[in-house]
């Protein structure tokens, strides 16, 4: 019997971007991915600041896969999500996972909050879904581009690819300053991937 390839490992994360989670948390992430039949490909770049975007976002399962990936990578990442999902009783768990509740009616406040995070510590990784919804989005929101400028960092494009059951840590994208151009270029990159519900992307 051959040695089974790990689904994900903290060696895929630079030391300075690793969280202080214990071995049990990393085991949980690996186990969830293994049970579901998924694996993580690629390396987190060795940079001080990163804005991570994840797509295609077509299913509630995306959240489970994302959290398992973060735990398995032992990645110290803060991720932005609608404040409405931070329900009483689970807020502590969501925040332990790195969640930051955001009110999308106040985009400037979000940018300022993220910029403050970037000024702290030895490195920061912020995650966001550019589509903003699981439903088919004809036009992506540009907030993540503003966040990248506020952080003064490149965008790491991470993809869910259902046909191969792979989480792909993909290319770095450096925003040009032209939001329309950047959205087209980034969406074209994601055209090669297929979400769990392909008709929603």
Cite the ranges covered by each PLM segment.
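Non-catalytic C-terminal accessory region of glycerolipid acyltransferases
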Residues: 2-20, 24, 35, 107-201
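Helix-to-loop junction immediately C-terminal to a conserved catalytic motif
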Residues: 21-57
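Surface-exposed charge patches
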Residues: 31, 68, 92, 116, ...
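Residues at alpha-helix termini
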Residues: 34-35, 72, 96, 150
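Short Gly/charged-rich anion-binding patches and loops
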Residues: 27-28, 65, 89, 142-143
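Acidic/glycine-enriched edge-of-secondary-structure segments
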Residues: 18-30, 94-106
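Catalytic core of membrane glycerolipid acyltransferases/transacylases, capturing the structured
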Residues: 43-105, 162, 171
């Amino acid at each position: 019997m051959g040695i089974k390839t790990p689904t994900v490992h903290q060696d895929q994360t630079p030391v300075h971007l690793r969280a202080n989670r214990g071995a049990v948390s990393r085991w949980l992430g690996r186990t969830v991915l293994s049970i579901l039949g998924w694996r993580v490909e690629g390396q987190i770049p060795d940079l001080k600041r990163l804005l991570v975007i994840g797509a295609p976002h077509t299913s509630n399962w995306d959240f489970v896969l994302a959290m398992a990936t973060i735990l398995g990578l032992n990645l110290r990442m803060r991720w932005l999500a609608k404040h409405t999902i931070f329900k009483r009783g689970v807020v502590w768990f969501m925040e332990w996972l790195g969640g930051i509740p955001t009110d999308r009616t106040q985009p400037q406040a979000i940018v300022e909050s993220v910029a403050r995070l970037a000024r702290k510590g030895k490195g920061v990784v912020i995650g966001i879904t550019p589509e903003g919804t699981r439903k088919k989005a004809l036009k992506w929101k540009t907030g993540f581009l503003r966040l990248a400028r506020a952080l003064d960092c490149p965008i790491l494009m991470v993809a869910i690819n259902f046909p191969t059951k792979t989480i792909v840590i993909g290319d770095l994208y450096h925003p040009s300053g032209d939001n329309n151009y950047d959205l087209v270029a980034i969406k074209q990159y994601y055209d090669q991937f297929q979400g769990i519900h392909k008709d929603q992307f």
